[in-house]
Amino acid sequence: MNQFQCCICGRNNSEINQAHRELMLCAQCGSNARFRGLMLGVMRYAFNEESKPLIKQSDRRSITAIGISDSEIYAWPLAAKLSYANTYYHTEPQLDICDLRSIDQYSNIDLIICSDVIEHTPLAPRKVLENMRRMLRPGGILILSAPTYHLPETIEWYPDAASLEVKDCGGRHEVRWSDTSGAKHVDFRPCFHGGPGSTLEMRLIAHQDLIQAGMDAGFEVETLEFSPEIGYVWPIVPEYPGIAAPMDGRVLVLRRPHETPVKGRGYPR
């Protein structure tokens, strides 16, 4: 691919750096290939318009949207177009997608964007997806990404963890954890995203497992296929040390179906 037009800011890019979901940076807004895939999903399924970039979309203030620690690269254009709030784990406006009390502060949402979060959650992906489904109105959309792999099954680094603590041992980090049987474990080589001691990787997710988790959580699920013309594309090749399976990482679009209400009870949560 020699060029692309950024679907966020509209910049035509011809000098393209390394093809990777975290690279292929737009020369104007700085978006990477993953961000552009997310916004393609938003424009296709929320705006129903993908022929023009995000910053030139018409205002859709009737659409309520939640970001889960979204990048400012696309958070500010979304805030300018939608009734959108970017939420955070550690600060306001706060949202913990593993905590029902936090989840239940939000309801009847049209659109949720959750990018590269679900590989870090203490709860398994299916449960987290069930929680996000609670937040959506019937017919609502979740735009989801994770660094998924063509593995036969998801690898959980801390299976059945009941407690977990990251310890800084003189510049070297280790994870001390106990499983539900009470057995204690130490991981001397944990993987962090964003630098040592930052965001702990809890699992390597198989792409098909994430699709199945979405369906098991009550969603209709679609893999958003690549669109090279907007810079949403990367090679699906092995890249994880010691893992031969290729990294996929394509964006998923999950729709909460329109359920038939139960008389006297309304829609199921």
Report residues per predicted region.
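A conserved beta-strand element that flanks and buttresses the S-adenosyl-L-methionine
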Residues: 113
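S-adenosyl-L-methionine-dependent methyltransferase catalytic module, highlighting the catalytic core
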Residues: 4, 123-137, 141-268
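Conserved N-terminal segment of class I S-adenosyl-L-methionine
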Residues: 1-107, 229-238, 246-251, 257-269
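Short catalytic micro-motifs in class I SAM-dependent methyltransferases
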Residues: 116-120
